[in-house]
């Protein structure tokens, strides 16, 4: 077999559309929560592919599931169903409030499906009906949210920097203030078909919703016959210490979207809902070529089986505390964080005023010492590691973070 051509980081700049600015090294191998680059340098992975690699890299059971299915059938298309997709659907239904599942390839697709479902349900059940004043097609979302990059979902996300260059944007979307129920109450009316919210705003700064806020949204949606959609793309599949974050709050959505960790690194997305709302969609009303792909569903079924275990979920909560304790010690030495927040293994370290705007600089400095981490805006350093990362890897990774922080501190104070 012909040897592949050598590639470098410069190859990215020459050949790839410049929608990303990746690190200056190329990862070639991963095992557990450790990665290696082309030069053999090792990195502790606190990013997890942005909350995707929930079981780390190269988990033997996940790899075995992929290989086993690859020996059977890879793809069929939606004219035929397959065993892995049916088994995965049943797993999700048994584990959540849902009764029906729509499979797709990504979080953006899952959110797109959820928003289309909401408008279709409202059209079928309320448009031109007695007592309905005006059309019922308005969507309420929240500032600093992130719901994907399609034109519809990027419009729902309340971050103009991602949408302002693509006008005209889809209409009928209104943005309230996250965790401000009075703000939401002003926007949610009988013309509202859906409210979409993240239980924890991930890209928006790792900001958890207040329990009262989500319960209030539930009540407002019930009052105005609007669907409550929980975007659990980042918080789902064990990330917060429950299978889905809504389980922390004691409030169930009408629709839930899931992706990222669901495939453990293999692309897959899902929209979960009840029979009542799923009935709004009929054959041909929505679809996606690769949705329910046998390879993706076989992998996701194994990932879900491994994660949806009491011991593993309890371990996520324990690891959260390990992180918090070590981060508090780092902050006692360097005084860079104003707040450490999040749930489970979705953690955000908010920089104080002296270090405002330096999250990317800290992450880049930490990478020099062998740590891969994330940002959530200019003022938040974010961690979303494997749910089974070892205590040793946590301690070593945070030691490398501390070295990166010290490097930035020296620049700031010199």
From Swiss-Prot:
InterPro entries listed in its UniProt record: Ac/SucOrn_transaminase_bac (IPR017652), AcOrn/SuccOrn_fam (IPR004636), Aminotrans_3 (IPR005814), Aminotrans_3_PPA_site (IPR049704), Class-III_PLP-dep_AT (IPR050103), PyrdxlP-dep_Trfase (IPR015424), PyrdxlP-dep_Trfase_major (IPR015421), PyrdxlP-dep_Trfase_small (IPR015422)
Documented EC number(s): 2.6.1.81
UniProt pathway: Amino-acid degradation; L-arginine degradation via AST pathway; L-glutamate and succinate from L-arginine: step 3/5
Keyword check for Transferase: yes
Pfam families xrefs: Aminotran_3 (PF00202)
Statement: the UniProt record of this protein carries the keyword Transmembrane: no
Modified residues (N6-(pyridoxal phosphate)lysine): 260
Catalytic activity: N(2)-succinyl-L-ornithine + 2-oxoglutarate = N-succinyl-L-glutamate 5-semialdehyde + L-glutamate
Gene Ontology biological process terms in this record: alpha-amino acid biosynthetic process; arginine catabolic process to glutamate; arginine catabolic process to succinate; ornithine catabolic process
Domain of life: Bacteria
UniProt keyword list: Aminotransferase, Arginine metabolism, Pyridoxal phosphate, Transferase
Essential cofactor(s): pyridoxal 5'-phosphate
A molecular function (GO) term: pyridoxal phosphate binding
Function: Catalyzes the transamination of N(2)-succinylornithine and alpha-ketoglutarate into N(2)-succinylglutamate semialdehyde and glutamate. Can also act as an acetylornithine aminotransferase.
Family per record: Belongs to the class-III pyridoxal-phosphate-dependent aminotransferase family. AstC subfamily.
Descriptive protein name: Succinylornithine transaminase
Organism encoding this protein: Yersinia pseudotuberculosis serotype O:1b (strain IP 31758)
Primary gene name: astC
């Amino acid at each position: 077999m012909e040897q592949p051509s050598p590639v470098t980081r410069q190859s990215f700049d020459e050949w790839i559309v410049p929608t990303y600015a990746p690190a200056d090294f190329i990862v070639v191998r991963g095992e557990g929560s450790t990665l290696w680059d082309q030069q053999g340098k090792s990195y502790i992975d606190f990013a997890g592919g942005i909350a995707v690699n929930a079981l780390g890299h190269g988990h033997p059971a996940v790899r075995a599931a992929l290989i086993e299915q690859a020996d059977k059938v890879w793809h069929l298309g939606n004219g035929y169903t397959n065993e892995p997709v049916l088994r995965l659907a049943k797993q999700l239904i048994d584990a959540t409030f849902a009764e029906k599942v729509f499979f797709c390839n990504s979080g953006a697709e899952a959110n797109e499906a959820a928003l289309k479902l909401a408008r279709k349900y409202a059209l079928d059940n309320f448009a031109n009906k007695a007592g309905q004043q005006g059309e019922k097609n308005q969507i309420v979302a929240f500032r600093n949210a992130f719901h994907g990059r399609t034109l519809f979902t990027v419009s729902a996300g309340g971050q103009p920097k991602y949408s302002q260059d693509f006008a005209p944007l889809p209409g009928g979307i209104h943005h309230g203030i996250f965790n401000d129920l009075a703000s939401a109450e002003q926007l949610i009316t009988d013309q509202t078909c859906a409210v979409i919210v993240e239980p924890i705003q991930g890209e928006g700064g790792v900001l958890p919703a207040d329990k009262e806020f989500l319960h209030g949204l539930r009540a407002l949606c019930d009052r105005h016959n609007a669907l409550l959609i929980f975007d659990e793309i980042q918080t789902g599949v064990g990330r917060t210490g429950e299978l889905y974050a809504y389980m922390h709050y004691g409030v169930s959505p009408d629709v839930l979207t899931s992706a990222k960790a669901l495939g453990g690194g293999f692309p897959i997305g899902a929209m979960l809902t009840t029979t009542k709302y799923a009935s709004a969609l009929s054959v041909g009303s929505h679809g996606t070529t690769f949705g329910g792909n046998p390879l993706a569903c076989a992998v996701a079924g194994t990932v879900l089986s491994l994660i949806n275990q009491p011991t593993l979920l309890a371990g996520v909560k324990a690891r959260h505390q390990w992180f918090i304790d070590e981060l508090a010690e780092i902050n006692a030495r360097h005084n860079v964080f104003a707040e450490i927040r999040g749930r489970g293994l979705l953690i955000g370290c908010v920089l104080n005023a002296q270090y405002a705007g330096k999250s990317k600089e800290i992450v880049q400095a930490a990478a020099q010492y062998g740590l891969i981490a994330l940002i959530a805006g200019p003022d938040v350093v974010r961690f979303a590691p494997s749910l089974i990362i070892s205590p040793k890897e946590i301690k070593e990774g945070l030691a490398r973070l501390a070295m990166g922080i010290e490097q930035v501190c020296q620049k700031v104070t010199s």
